[in-house]
Every structure is written in C-alpha cells, then in structure tokens.
Amino acid sequence: MIGIIGAMEEEVAILKDKLTDMNEISVAHVKFYRGKLNSKEVVLTQSGIGKVNAAISTTLIIEKFNPKLIINTGSAGALDESLSVGDMLISNDVVYHDVDATAFGYKLGQIPQMPLEFKSDQELLKSVETVINKKNYNAKIGQIVSGDSFIGSVDQRLTIKRQFPEAMAVEMEATAIAQTCHQFHVPFIVTRAVSDLANGKADISFEEFLGEAAKSSSSIVESLIKVL
C-alpha cells in the first residue's frame, strides 16, 4: 500500500480520477480514497492546507492503512532562481522555515528534540531519479521549506532564502508530513511543481498555474508508482 497526500482538491483530483476499484472511507473529517493506480494498491487523501491538517491526515493514513511509504504531491513557490513556473522539485530534505527555538540552543527551523532536516528516503530518491531520466522531466532535487504562510512578497522570499540558503522552494505542508513519517518510521518523498515564484505576483501566478502544477506533480507520481 502506497499513501499519497495532497493539500488541495486540484492537487489530488487528477490522481483520484485515475483510481480503479476505488472505495471512499471517512475517518474524522478526512476522506480517503483507496484503490489501484497503475496496478498498485494506493490510498489517496486531501489533507487540507497547513501543517496541522497535514500532520493529522498523515497520522490517520498511517494508523488506518499502514502504507509502506508516503508520497506528498502538490505545488510550491520557487525560492531558487534556477526554477521557473512549471518546473518540478523533488525533496532531498524538508525543513520548517517558521520555527524558532534558538533561545534554547536549537538551530533555526528545528523543533526541539527533532532533527533540523527530515530527509527523504534514499531508495525513493533513486527511483525518482530513474523516472526523471527516463521521462525527461524538467525536475531538480533539493531542499523544500514549509510554514503556515503563503509567501507572496519579495521581502518574505528574501528573508527565507537568507535564513535557509539551501532552500529551493516553499510551501505549507511537506515538513509536517515528513515529521509525522519520521515519528512513525515511514519512508516519504515530496514531489512539488512550481506554481509561482514566491514574489509580489505570487497570488496571481498561483491561481493561474495551480492546475498546470497539479498536472505536472500528478504525472511524476504516476510514473514513480510504476517503478515502486
């Protein structure tokens, strides 16, 4: 069983439409769609936006369905200048950009008693690299940062990039999903398509390109599942 999590309806609708033998299961406020995708058993859910929603849905999917791995799919704002709208980014690791316990000796972004970076499963990364090379996806592998804010100004973007110079993209759920997977010892990977450049026009770009970003991210998830 493979778990797939997206935050928004647009980010899961394409995959949901391609499920066969689908059953809908509701747990608390969350709906799960269990079926087959490319002949593989999967369970798909729309978590809702933000870190708490993501953590709740990840906990439920792990406890209820016991997936062997979790894929987080969706969109992100680019922080790295090499990324353009429509490009794909795969997580090497994920970090919170809105956590600060430095007063107690922790690094910026580090939850107390947790690692600073939550690293993607290396075998999953190898599988993704195989897919990228075979399908010629315009994709890069790098760090993704998460926080409970939509980054829609140049000042916000520059602040995050200054504090987390390795960060290539920013979004609102991935690190919460990764932390939950870390706690439950479940491998994870994040696939995000760039929907905006996290600048003063980010809100307009996001609305315009979310659909295309969802198509791109869903496509790489489908291709990845084929080789798992």
UniProtKB/Swiss-Prot annotation:
Name of one Pfam family that matches: PNP_UDP_1
Gene3D superfamilies in the record: Nucleoside phosphorylase domain
Reactions that this protein is recorded to catalyse: S-adenosyl-L-homocysteine + H2O = S-(5-deoxy-D-ribos-5-yl)-L-homocysteine + adenine; S-methyl-5'-thioadenosine + H2O = 5-(methylsulfanyl)-D-ribose + adenine; 5'-deoxyadenosine + H2O = 5-deoxy-D-ribose + adenine
GO MF annotations in UniProt: adenosylhomocysteine nucleosidase activity; methylthioadenosine nucleosidase activity
Cystine pairings recorded for this chain: none
Catalytic class of the enzyme: hydrolase
HAMAP family tied to this protein: Salvage_MtnN
Alphabetized InterPro entries for the sequence: MTA_SAH_Nsdase, Nucleoside_phosphorylase_d, Nucleoside_phosphorylase_sf
Organism: Staphylococcus haemolyticus (strain JCSC1435)
Active site: E11, D196
Superkingdom classification of source: Bacteria
Gene Ontology biological-process entries: L-methionine salvage from methylthioadenosine; L-methionine salvage from S-adenosylmethionine; nucleoside catabolic process
Family label: Belongs to the PNP/UDP phosphorylase family. MtnN subfamily.
Binding site for substrate: G77, I151, M172, E173
Protein name: 5'-methylthioadenosine/S-adenosylhomocysteine nucleosidase
GO annotations of cellular component type: cytosol
Role of this protein: Catalyzes the irreversible cleavage of the glycosidic bond in both 5'-methylthioadenosine (MTA) and S-adenosylhomocysteine (SAH/AdoHcy) to adenine and the corresponding thioribose, 5'-methylthioribose and S-ribosylhomocysteine, respectively. Also cleaves 5'-deoxyadenosine, a toxic by-product of radical S-adenosylmethionine (SAM) enzymes, into 5-deoxyribose and adenine.
Pathway where this protein functions: Amino-acid biosynthesis; L-methionine biosynthesis via salvage pathway; S-methyl-5-thio-alpha-D-ribose 1-phosphate from S-methyl-5'-thioadenosine (hydrolase route): step 1/2
EC assignment: 3.2.2.9
Alphabetically ordered keywords of this record: Amino-acid biosynthesis, Hydrolase, Methionine biosynthesis
Record has Hydrolase as a keyword: yes
